[in-house]
């Protein structure tokens, strides 16, 4: 079984670090040329340097743009007019007491976590459909299904992505383009590590902090540990490949068994 993406062009939003960077590396290993996106040019350059160290024969191009804005999304599309694979990974999260989330915060989360993906899909999906092949993916979260009380604004956006993904899959029906979302479970990224330490204690050894977090805040996990970014990337690369040609309109889980359901 070969995940052959040779000759394909991919754009991964928010990919200078974390899950996005792992996805970019995985797609490059499978043969795709990858547009690596971030809004901070210096951080983006460092991210690409790290990716090239990980995947020496990988092909990466920097797409410096804040795709959470209308202007930034247009800049990204201008920089990479053709994409066979679009991975909408960009997202922000921060714990906030539910009744203290302001209108501006609700709008900001929707702009970054949802509208950025919608804008890019509107730009790339018609071009993919015209060519008769493409992959559009949305990185959602277990928080879309199991809404965390400390992050309901984040959970709302990730639920919205499931609806967006299913809707665009219907729009692309019969075109040769597949559209899916990935429900990622609690994942070990730099941002999540900071979040964990805020909740359980900044001075604890990491293994102990992770164990306490999973026990007290994510006890539903059957994995009983945080997922590594590469474990999310494996599913994304498969869904981006020709092997996943019959999978569309789905919300596929890489959640470590966190979502308590027998359904996918």
Question: Which residues does each predicted region cover?
Answer:
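Residue(s) in the substrate-gating loop at a strand-loop-helix junction
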Residues: 141
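Alpha-helical segment proximal to the catalytic Tyr-Lys
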Residues: 126, 170-171
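Active-site helix of classical SDR
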Residues: 121, 157, 165
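Short C-terminal tail/terminal secondary-structure segment
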Residues: 1-6, 146, 236-237, 248-264
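Substrate-binding pocket helix/loop in short-chain dehydrogenase/reductase
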Residues: 97-98, 105-110, 217
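Conserved glycine-rich cofactor-binding loop
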Residues: 9, 16-17
């Amino acid at each position: 079984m070969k995940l052959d993406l040779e000759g394909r062009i991919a754009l991964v939003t928010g990919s200078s670090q974390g899950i996005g960077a792992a996805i970019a590396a995985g797609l490059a290993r499978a043969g795709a040329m990858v547009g690596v996106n971030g809004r901070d040019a210096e951080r983006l350059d460092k991210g690409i340097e790290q990716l090239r160290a990980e995947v020496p024969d990988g092909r990466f191009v920097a797409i410096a743009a804040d795709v959470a804005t209308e202007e930034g999304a247009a800049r990204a599309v201008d920089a990479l007019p053709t994409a066979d694979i679009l991975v909408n990974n960009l997202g922000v999260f921060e714990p906030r007491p539910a009744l203290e989330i302001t209108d501006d915060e609700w709008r900001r989360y929707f702009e970054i976590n949802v509208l950025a993906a919608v804008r890019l899909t509107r730009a790339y999906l018609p071009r993919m459909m015209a060519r008769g092949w493409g992959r559009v993916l949305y990185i959602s979260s277990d928080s879309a299904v199991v809404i965390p009380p400390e992050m309901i604004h984040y959970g709302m956006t990730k639920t919205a992505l499931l609806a967006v993904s299913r809707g665009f899959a219907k729009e692309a029906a019969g075109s040769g383009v597949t559209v899916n979302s990935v429900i990622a479970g609690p994942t070990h990224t730099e941002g999540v590590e900071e979040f964990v330490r805020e909740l359980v204690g900044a001075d604890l050894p990491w293994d102990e902090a992770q164990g306490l977090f999973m026990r007290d805040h994510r006890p539903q996990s059957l994995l009983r540990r945080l997922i590594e970014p590469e474990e999310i990337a494996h599913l994304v690369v498969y869904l981006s490949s020709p092997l996943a040609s019959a999978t569309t309109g789905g919300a596929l889980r890489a959640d470590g068994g966190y979502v308590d359901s027998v359904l996918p």
